[in-house]
Amino acid sequence: MCVLKSRRKGFSFKGGSMMCRNYYLIPASKSYVYAANKQYLTDDGILTKAWDYMDFIDKHTAWGKKRSVNTAMRKRAGFISKDEYGNEVELGYKSEIIGVTLKDNPDVVRGKKANLILFEEAGSCKELAAAWQIARPSVEIDGVAFAPMIAFGTGGDEDSNFATLKDMFYNPEGYNCLGLPNIWDETPTDKECGFFCP
């Protein structure tokens, strides 16, 4: 799905909640969020919001989970125990939320089977076109999606970075995205577009 939006619409909160839903309710799930810069993930970014949700859920609800990995870019539900032979083994839910920065290298998305993939601040990501196509096999079998992949963002600071998100919006079928009737453009058209949040 391609989402073109204006600023301050809460999509980092929405994305964080989607990842937490998988983390707490789907064992061994993997939710990835990709961004061009680490600051879009951390600081006041989507992962920080997800971690705040997790801290609240762990403290105030019955769904709390221990974390076998607990870093600024990755959380994994689980714990280490010893088996009858004294070997350390990981037990628990084993669901994960993982943040990855593209850093001018769209190949970092390759080979990651996922239950959810988000592209944060996609309008500022010059690697979006290549990364999207490379990531598609992570959520598709023979062109049929078994998990959602969502790119959302606003126009970037540089026109060239926004070009791919704009193309995805006006040509959703070319990216295997959900197409919706285009009721937003001044000139009526029967072509479909991505999701728009004014």
Describe each model-derived feature in a short phrase:
Residues M1-P198:
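Phosphate/NTP-binding elements of NTP-utilizing enzymes
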